[in-house]
Amino acid sequence: MANEIVKEMIEAGVHFGHRTSLWNPKMAPYIFGKKNQIHILDIRETLRGLLRAKKYLSQVAAGGSLILFVGTKRQAGEAVEEQSLRCGMPFVSERWLGGTLTNFRTIRSRLGRLEELEALRAGDGINDYSKKMQSSLNREYRKMYRNLNGLRTMNRLPEVMFIVDPGKERNAVREAKRLGITTVALIDTDSDPSQIDLPIPGNDDGIRSVEMIMRELADAVIAGKGQTQTEAAPNAQAAPEAAAPAEQPAEEAAAASSEG
Protein backbone atom coordinates (compact mmCIF):
# COMPACT_ATOMS: atom_id res chain seq x y z
CA MET A 1 0.00 0.00 0.00
CA ALA A 2 2.78 2.44 0.95
CA ASN A 3 4.67 1.66 -2.26
CA GLU A 4 1.55 2.42 -4.30
CA ILE A 5 1.13 5.77 -2.57
CA VAL A 6 4.82 6.62 -3.10
CA LYS A 7 4.51 5.82 -6.80
CA GLU A 8 1.42 7.99 -7.08
CA MET A 9 3.13 10.84 -5.21
CA ILE A 10 6.10 10.76 -7.56
CA GLU A 11 3.85 10.69 -10.63
CA ALA A 12 1.94 13.68 -9.22
CA GLY A 13 5.17 15.60 -8.57
CA VAL A 14 4.56 15.85 -4.83
CA HIS A 15 8.33 15.77 -4.23
CA PHE A 16 9.11 18.97 -6.14
CA GLY A 17 9.76 21.99 -3.94
CA HIS A 18 10.37 25.65 -4.69
CA ARG A 19 13.47 27.31 -6.08
CA THR A 20 16.37 26.97 -3.67
CA SER A 21 16.58 30.75 -3.26
CA LEU A 22 13.08 30.80 -1.74
CA TRP A 23 13.50 28.10 0.87
CA ASN A 24 12.79 28.29 4.58
CA PRO A 25 15.73 26.76 6.52
CA LYS A 26 13.27 25.15 8.94
CA MET A 27 12.26 22.81 6.09
CA ALA A 28 15.81 21.43 5.84
CA PRO A 29 14.99 18.12 7.64
CA TYR A 30 12.38 17.37 4.97
CA ILE A 31 14.57 18.11 1.94
CA PHE A 32 16.45 15.37 0.09
CA GLY A 33 18.52 17.56 -2.19
CA LYS A 34 18.38 19.98 -5.09
CA LYS A 35 18.28 19.78 -8.86
CA ASN A 36 18.38 22.63 -11.37
CA GLN A 37 18.01 25.12 -8.51
CA ILE A 38 14.84 23.38 -7.31
CA HIS A 39 14.65 21.67 -3.92
CA ILE A 40 13.61 18.02 -3.96
CA LEU A 41 11.64 16.87 -0.93
CA ASP A 42 12.37 13.55 0.77
CA ILE A 43 9.44 11.46 -0.42
CA ARG A 44 9.70 9.27 2.68
CA GLU A 45 9.05 12.27 4.89
CA THR A 46 6.06 13.18 2.73
CA LEU A 47 4.72 9.65 3.10
CA ARG A 48 5.22 9.69 6.87
CA GLY A 49 3.46 13.03 7.16
CA LEU A 50 0.59 11.92 4.94
CA LEU A 51 0.01 8.64 6.78
CA ARG A 52 0.17 10.41 10.14
CA ALA A 53 -2.35 13.01 8.96
CA LYS A 54 -4.67 10.36 7.48
CA LYS A 55 -4.70 8.41 10.72
CA TYR A 56 -5.44 11.52 12.76
CA LEU A 57 -8.18 12.85 10.48
CA SER A 58 -9.82 9.43 10.40
CA GLN A 59 -9.83 9.33 14.20
CA VAL A 60 -11.28 12.80 14.70
CA ALA A 61 -13.88 12.22 11.98
CA ALA A 62 -14.90 9.02 13.75
CA GLY A 63 -15.39 11.06 16.91
CA GLY A 64 -17.69 13.52 15.16
CA SER A 65 -15.22 16.39 14.88
CA LEU A 66 -15.48 19.07 12.21
CA ILE A 67 -12.53 19.49 9.86
CA LEU A 68 -12.27 22.74 7.92
CA PHE A 69 -10.35 22.49 4.63
CA VAL A 70 -8.69 25.70 3.42
CA GLY A 71 -6.98 26.37 0.09
CA THR A 72 -7.63 29.59 -1.79
CA LYS A 73 -4.78 29.61 -4.30
CA ARG A 74 -5.69 28.93 -7.92
CA GLN A 75 -4.01 25.52 -7.95
CA ALA A 76 -5.88 24.33 -4.86
CA GLY A 77 -9.40 25.76 -4.92
CA GLU A 78 -11.06 23.19 -7.14
CA ALA A 79 -9.58 20.16 -5.37
CA VAL A 80 -10.36 21.61 -1.94
CA GLU A 81 -13.99 22.18 -2.87
CA GLU A 82 -14.47 18.85 -4.64
CA GLN A 83 -12.91 16.67 -1.95
CA SER A 84 -14.46 18.58 0.96
CA LEU A 85 -17.91 18.10 -0.55
CA ARG A 86 -17.13 14.42 -1.11
CA CYS A 87 -16.25 13.84 2.54
CA GLY A 88 -18.94 16.16 3.89
CA MET A 89 -16.72 18.77 5.54
CA PRO A 90 -16.74 22.60 5.35
CA PHE A 91 -14.23 24.42 3.18
CA VAL A 92 -12.85 27.78 2.09
CA SER A 93 -11.66 27.74 -1.53
CA GLU A 94 -12.05 31.33 -2.71
CA ARG A 95 -11.03 33.85 -0.07
CA TRP A 96 -10.33 33.69 3.64
CA LEU A 97 -12.49 36.29 5.34
CA GLY A 98 -10.84 37.80 8.40
CA GLY A 99 -12.63 36.57 11.50
CA THR A 100 -13.94 33.37 9.91
CA LEU A 101 -12.96 31.62 13.14
CA THR A 102 -12.33 34.38 15.66
CA ASN A 103 -15.56 36.20 14.79
CA PHE A 104 -17.60 33.13 13.94
CA ARG A 105 -20.88 34.59 15.19
CA THR A 106 -20.74 37.25 12.49
CA ILE A 107 -19.96 34.65 9.84
CA ARG A 108 -23.04 32.68 10.90
CA SER A 109 -25.17 35.80 10.60
CA ARG A 110 -23.84 36.38 7.09
CA LEU A 111 -24.78 32.82 6.20
CA GLY A 112 -28.27 33.66 7.38
CA ARG A 113 -28.28 36.61 4.99
CA LEU A 114 -27.13 34.31 2.18
CA GLU A 115 -30.09 32.03 2.84
CA GLU A 116 -32.43 35.04 2.78
CA LEU A 117 -31.13 36.07 -0.62
CA GLU A 118 -31.48 32.54 -1.95
CA ALA A 119 -35.09 32.37 -0.79
CA LEU A 120 -35.75 35.74 -2.41
CA ARG A 121 -34.25 34.60 -5.72
CA ALA A 122 -36.01 31.24 -5.63
CA GLY A 123 -39.45 32.82 -5.35
CA ASP A 124 -41.03 35.82 -7.01
CA GLY A 125 -40.11 38.20 -4.20
CA ILE A 126 -37.16 39.67 -6.06
CA ASN A 127 -39.53 40.94 -8.76
CA ASP A 128 -41.00 43.37 -6.22
CA TYR A 129 -37.76 45.34 -6.35
CA SER A 130 -36.60 47.80 -8.99
CA LYS A 131 -34.21 46.60 -11.69
CA LYS A 132 -31.40 48.51 -10.02
CA MET A 133 -32.10 46.91 -6.64
CA GLN A 134 -32.41 43.46 -8.24
CA SER A 135 -28.98 43.94 -9.79
CA SER A 136 -27.56 45.01 -6.42
CA LEU A 137 -29.11 42.02 -4.62
CA ASN A 138 -27.81 39.62 -7.26
CA ARG A 139 -24.28 41.04 -6.90
CA GLU A 140 -24.51 40.68 -3.15
CA TYR A 141 -25.69 37.10 -3.53
CA ARG A 142 -22.91 36.10 -5.93
CA LYS A 143 -20.22 37.58 -3.70
CA MET A 144 -21.59 35.95 -0.55
CA TYR A 145 -22.09 32.61 -2.27
CA ARG A 146 -18.52 32.62 -3.56
CA ASN A 147 -17.02 33.40 -0.16
CA LEU A 148 -19.38 31.61 2.24
CA ASN A 149 -20.97 28.67 0.46
CA GLY A 150 -18.38 26.19 1.72
CA LEU A 151 -19.07 27.13 5.35
CA ARG A 152 -22.77 26.20 5.36
CA THR A 153 -22.18 22.94 7.22
CA MET A 154 -19.90 24.56 9.82
CA ASN A 155 -22.47 25.08 12.57
CA ARG A 156 -19.72 25.42 15.19
CA LEU A 157 -16.01 26.05 15.29
CA PRO A 158 -13.99 23.18 13.78
CA GLU A 159 -11.73 21.02 15.90
CA VAL A 160 -9.21 20.66 13.06
CA MET A 161 -8.16 22.72 10.06
CA PHE A 162 -6.29 21.46 7.00
CA ILE A 163 -4.45 24.08 4.95
CA VAL A 164 -2.88 24.04 1.51
CA ASP A 165 0.12 26.39 1.71
CA PRO A 166 0.09 27.83 5.25
CA GLY A 167 2.36 30.64 4.05
CA LYS A 168 -0.38 32.00 1.82
CA GLU A 169 -3.08 31.20 4.38
CA ARG A 170 -1.18 32.75 7.29
CA ASN A 171 -4.28 34.59 8.54
CA ALA A 172 -6.22 31.33 8.72
CA VAL A 173 -3.34 29.67 10.57
CA ARG A 174 -3.11 32.60 12.97
CA GLU A 175 -6.82 32.38 13.83
CA ALA A 176 -6.63 28.61 14.31
CA LYS A 177 -3.63 28.87 16.64
CA ARG A 178 -5.32 31.61 18.64
CA LEU A 179 -8.32 29.35 19.26
CA GLY A 180 -6.34 26.15 19.86
CA ILE A 181 -7.57 24.46 16.68
CA THR A 182 -5.29 21.66 15.49
CA THR A 183 -3.61 22.43 12.17
CA VAL A 184 -2.65 19.97 9.44
CA ALA A 185 -1.06 21.30 6.26
CA LEU A 186 0.46 20.52 2.89
CA ILE A 187 3.61 22.58 3.28
CA ASP A 188 6.26 23.38 0.66
CA THR A 189 9.92 24.25 1.06
CA ASP A 190 9.23 27.98 1.43
CA SER A 191 7.06 27.73 4.57
CA ASP A 192 7.63 27.35 8.32
CA PRO A 193 6.66 23.85 9.54
CA SER A 194 6.95 24.89 13.19
CA GLN A 195 3.64 26.75 12.85
CA ILE A 196 1.78 23.54 11.94
CA ASP A 197 0.86 20.68 14.27
CA LEU A 198 0.96 17.98 11.58
CA PRO A 199 2.92 19.06 8.48
CA ILE A 200 2.83 17.10 5.23
CA PRO A 201 5.94 18.23 3.33
CA GLY A 202 5.01 18.42 -0.33
CA ASN A 203 4.41 20.43 -3.47
CA ASP A 204 1.61 22.90 -2.73
CA ASP A 205 1.77 24.58 -6.16
CA GLY A 206 1.13 21.62 -8.45
CA ILE A 207 -2.51 20.90 -9.24
CA ARG A 208 -1.95 17.13 -9.44
CA SER A 209 -0.02 17.17 -6.17
CA VAL A 210 -2.76 19.04 -4.32
CA GLU A 211 -5.45 16.82 -5.85
CA MET A 212 -3.64 13.66 -4.77
CA ILE A 213 -3.12 14.80 -1.17
CA MET A 214 -6.68 16.10 -0.86
CA ARG A 215 -8.09 12.84 -2.22
CA GLU A 216 -6.09 10.77 0.27
CA LEU A 217 -7.22 12.93 3.19
CA ALA A 218 -10.86 12.90 2.08
CA ASP A 219 -10.70 9.10 1.88
CA ALA A 220 -9.42 9.03 5.47
CA VAL A 221 -12.26 11.27 6.66
CA ILE A 222 -14.86 9.13 4.89
CA ALA A 223 -13.37 5.98 6.43
CA GLY A 224 -13.42 7.59 9.87
CA LYS A 225 -17.02 8.71 9.54
CA GLY A 226 -17.90 5.12 8.72
CA GLN A 227 -16.71 3.99 12.15
CA THR A 228 -18.90 4.05 15.23
CA GLN A 229 -18.18 6.38 18.13
CA THR A 230 -16.95 3.47 20.25
CA GLU A 231 -14.48 2.44 17.57
CA ALA A 232 -12.81 5.84 17.59
CA ALA A 233 -9.56 6.22 19.51
CA PRO A 234 -10.12 7.45 23.09
CA ASN A 235 -7.96 10.54 22.59
CA ALA A 236 -8.80 11.06 18.96
CA GLN A 237 -8.92 14.83 19.18
CA ALA A 238 -5.42 15.17 20.62
CA ALA A 239 -3.07 15.62 17.69
CA PRO A 240 0.04 13.42 17.80
CA GLU A 241 3.36 15.23 17.80
CA ALA A 242 4.99 15.29 14.40
CA ALA A 243 7.73 12.68 14.42
CA ALA A 244 11.30 13.78 13.79
CA PRO A 245 12.36 13.39 10.15
CA ALA A 246 14.20 10.20 9.30
CA GLU A 247 17.97 10.40 9.16
CA GLN A 248 18.25 8.60 5.82
CA PRO A 249 16.29 9.77 2.76
CA ALA A 250 14.11 7.27 0.98
CA GLU A 251 15.36 5.39 -2.05
CA GLU A 252 12.22 6.48 -3.86
CA ALA A 253 13.23 10.12 -3.36
CA ALA A 254 16.64 9.47 -4.81
CA ALA A 255 15.06 7.84 -7.84
CA ALA A 256 12.58 10.66 -8.17
CA SER A 257 15.26 13.35 -8.09
CA SER A 258 17.27 11.59 -10.76
CA GLU A 259 14.20 11.26 -12.96
CA GLY A 260 13.49 15.03 -12.57
Curated annotation (Swiss-Prot):
Transmembrane segments: none annotated. The keyword Transcription regulation does not apply. GO terms for molecular function: structural constituent of ribosome. GO terms for cellular component: cytosolic small ribosomal subunit. GO terms for biological process: translation. Keywords: Ribonucleoprotein, Ribosomal protein. This is Small ribosomal subunit protein uS2. It comes from Rhodopirellula baltica (strain DSM 10527 / NCIMB 13988 / SH1). The lineage of its organism: Bacteria, Pseudomonadati, Planctomycetota, Planctomycetia, Pirellulales.
